[in-house]
């Protein structure tokens, strides 16, 4: 009986540690994504967004992964900095949801430079041991 309890305890502990590790990986991915947007690192952005990724802007406009990364590369979306205020991450197996609140300084779609209180809600999937963004919805807070 003691052996069974020990095995169950170790199994539960492993699951809890894995969930924490996943949350840490997702938090890092979120912060790094903003750094990559500022640096216009399209290679990394391409790697961390799934091929079927879709961004829904606060206006309701949808951008595919290719359109989104192209807009960053050509300056349609110019990101200058991001100060992260809050993240909430929920992990369920190989799927996760991240809601991040950041003060983002950007100039978008021909507008002037402005600091936005931007909330992004992401859906993520873990493929081959790596977390990827599959969907994002932008709003303000």
Map each language-model feature to its residues.
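Short, solvent-exposed loop/turn segments at secondary-structure boundaries
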Residues: 59-60, 109-113
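Surface-exposed, charged secondary-structure patches
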Residues: 72-110
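Hydrophobic pocket/interface hotspot
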Residues: 33, 44-45, 53, 68, ...
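A short gly/proline-enriched turn/hairpin at secondary-structure junctions
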Residues: 37-38, 52-63, 74-78
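A mature extracytoplasmic/lumenal domain signature
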Residues: 49, 59, 83, 88, ...
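Short, low-complexity N-terminal intrinsically disordered segments enriched in polar/charged residues
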Residues: 4, 8-51
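Short beta-strand edge/turn micro-motifs at domain boundaries
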Residues: 117-141
């Amino acid at each position: 009986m003691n052996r069974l309890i020990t095995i169950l305890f170790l199994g539960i502990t492993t699951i809890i540690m894995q969930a924490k590790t996943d949350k840490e990986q997702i938090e890092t991915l979120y912060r790094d994504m903003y750094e990559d947007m500022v640096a216009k690192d399209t290679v990394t952005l391409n790697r961390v967004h799934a091929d079927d990724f879709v961004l829904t802007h606060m206006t309701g406009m949808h951008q595919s992964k290719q359109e989104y990364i192209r807009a960053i590369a050509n300056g349609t979306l110019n990101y200058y900095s991001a100060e992260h205020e809050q993240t909430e991450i929920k992990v369920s197996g190989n799927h996760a949801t991240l809601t991040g609140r950041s003060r983002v300084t950007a100039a978008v779609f021909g507008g002037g430079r402005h600091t936005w209180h931007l909330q992004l809600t992401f859906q993520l999937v873990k493929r081959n041991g790596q977390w990827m963004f599959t969907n994002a919805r932008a709003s303000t807070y």
